[in-house]
Curated annotation (Swiss-Prot):
This is Hydroxyacylglutathione hydrolase GloC. Zn(2+) 2 binds at residues 59-60, 151, 192. GO terms for biological process: response to toxic substance. Pfam families: Lactamase_B. The keyword Hydrolase applies. Pathway: Secondary metabolite metabolism; methylglyoxal degradation; (R)-lactate from methylglyoxal: step 2/2. The keyword Hydrolase applies.
């Protein structure tokens, strides 16, 4: 698996461009700067197959429709419990003082816990990781030891829960019951900031080691 992390917009959201040896590609969480992403995909001569979304916040989906229209591909994800966020994208943009983004819905929801998504060269287990948003999901590639987990678990931190329908206890439960049981050597590609590993966060993440 080839992975290129492209931080986009003022939010510095980690857009993950992944591709196999045959140059079949997917993008996870294209949060913005569509022209830049298009240019990079074309520079690498990749065959973009699908757009994957972990959740419905604007900074993770902002370029999805432009990429869909340019490349003629579908948008898949998140869990349908985030539908209200996709429907409220114009309000999200207004709240942050950003140019308008039209509401849209993904072509496919991932509502089945543990579903295996088979793409060219990749096999992702879909985990429902609510807390940051109610429909947040993660894409886990066990064989290649990498997990794309959006805004759930960060290096030394966790996702915010002060957005609509966020819930701290639910987020902590998602991390403890879904992510921490993964192998320690699995690399976490978070929605913002540096990558980390499951083992590192088990040992040193203050939000997970607190006795409170």
């Amino acid at each position: 698996m080839n992975i290129e992390i492209i931080p986009v917009t003022a939010f510095q959201q980690n857009c993950s461009l992944i591709w196999d040896d045959e140059k079949n590609a997917a993008i996870i969480d294209p949060g913005g700067e569509a022209e830049r992403l298009i240019q990079r995909i074309e520079e690498l001569d990749l065959n973009l197959k699908v757009l994957l979304l972990t959740h419905g916040h604007l900074d993770h989906v902002g370029a999805a429709m432009q990429l869909k229209q340019h490349f003629g591909v579908e948008i898949w994800g998140s869990n349908e419990k985030d539908k209200f966020l996709f429907e409220s994208l114009p309000e999200q943009a207004q709240r942050f003082g950003l140019p308008n983004i039209d509401a849209f819905l993904p072509d496919r929801w991932f509502n089945q816990e543990g579903e295996i998504l088979k793409l060219d060269g990749f096999n992702f287990e879909i985990l429902h990781l609510p807390g940051h948003t109610p429909g947040h999901i993660g894409f886990i590639e066990h064989e290649k030891k990498v997990a794309f987990t959006g805004d759930v678990l960060f290096q030394g931190g966790i996702g915010r829960t002060d957005f609509p329908r966020g819930d701290y206890e639910t987020l902590i439960s998602s991390i403890r019951t879904k992510l921490l049981p993964l192998n320690d050597d699995i690399i976490i590609i978070a929605g913002h900031g540096s990558y980390t590993t499951i083992g590192q966060e088990k040992r040193s993440n203050p939000f997970l080691n607190s006795k409170s």
